[in-house]
Structure formats: structure tokens, C-alpha cells
Amino acid sequence: KRGHDVVLCDKNEELGGLMKLASVPIAKQDLAKVTQYMVRKLEEAGVEIRLNCEVNKNMLQNEFADYEVVMSNGASPVVIQPFTTFKHWATADDILGGKAFPGRRIVVIGGGSVGCETADYLAPLVYDRLPRDRKVTVIEMAPEVMSTESGPGRSLLVQRMMKKGIELICNAKVEKVEENKIYYSINGETHCISDADTLIFAVGYRPDKALADTLNELKITYHTIGDANSVGTIQDAIHAGYDLAKEL
């Protein structure tokens, strides 16, 4: 709108990033409309969109040598490496994105919004006529799940989880993971889960710094917004993009 020649590159086959995954959990499908709206506005503004396009050193040195660079490549889910010894593990993103498939005895490490929404998504439906015989357990270090969230959305989700029989273990810390066992402690007392067949990580995200390293190596000045700068909410990312666009 301000007259710039804008090229938007995304390494994925469609735009949206984590918004696509955020719209998968129960009662959050409407988030997909946000992405649809923004894509429509991009097209109306004449932005050149390149999908399946991961920006590399050669592109930065040649094709985009005279461009202002804005890095908004998001964040990656944190994986606790010592716990990957479990026989079958995945991140919540893997599950919601259909890249991994859980068994019937699932343990989710992390009781934040992502962990709880994933557990809710995987648990048997309330009043399901054909129960999937799936047991879901959430282990959270804080005194309660989704402790940083508030409002009716949190209350409804927690109520739904309890109705579905999801086991919520709070004030707990996973201490050790073996191929077939998960050990956690509460107030110094150790407990063991030995019947789980799937371990899911929902312990937050870490900004993806790979492109930043390349830009720094080439001594290219750039701007960082969204989760690539600091992991936050959808609103945070949208506002950051808008605020930066006003300055360029």
C-alpha cells in the first residue's frame, strides 16, 4: 500500500505458519479465517508470494541484494533431547499437523495452552458412541494447567478435559525417560508411568535463528518480527508486522 515492491517467501506449501496448527484444536477452527483474510489482502495489495521457497545465501547476495529484509520465519517447538529415548515421541506440532500419529496411552509433557489443546484434541469425544479407548495424561510443573491463561476459554477447555477423563498431573517434573517408562516427581516423591506408548512434547517454542546467522555472516541489516524475534501471541505478531511496516 505504501508503494514498496514486496516479495513474501515461505518455505512451506501454503501461508500461515503456526496459524494452520493453531486452528486444528477443538473450538479454534475459526482461526483459519484469519489466515484466509490476510492472504486475500496480500493478493489485493499485489504482494509477490513465493511458496516452497526457502531464502538462502545466494538469494540474499544476488536477487535480494537491494531489498530491505524482514525476518518473520517463526519458531520451532522445543524438544527435550534426553527424553527422546522413549520408544515413540513427537511434538504437539507434529501431532496437530498430521506428521505423527499417537497410540492409545499418551503422555503430554507441558500443560500450557498448546499441551492442553493437544490433549483435548486427542482424547475421546464426550459421549462418543465408539470410544477410542485412548487415555491421555498431561504433566505440568506449575500448580495448575494453563496457569498463564485466563478468561472463559481456559475454563471451558479445562472443564472439557475433565469430562473426557484426561489425567492432569500438576506440580510435577519429568525427571527421566527410558524406552518404555516415564519417571516424574511430586514433592520429592518419584512416580513412574509404564503403560504409555506415546510421549508428546508441548514445552514451548524457540525462535528459529538459522536465517539470522546467515544474515549476520553476510553483514546484512535486517528486521525481526513475530516469533522469530520473541515467542508471543497471534496478536503480538500482527501488531509487530504493522508497526514495522509503518516505519519502512
Describe each region flagged by the PLM.
Residues 17-67, 147-172, 180:
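N-terminal Rossmann-like dinucleotide/flavin-binding domain of flavoprotein oxidoreductases
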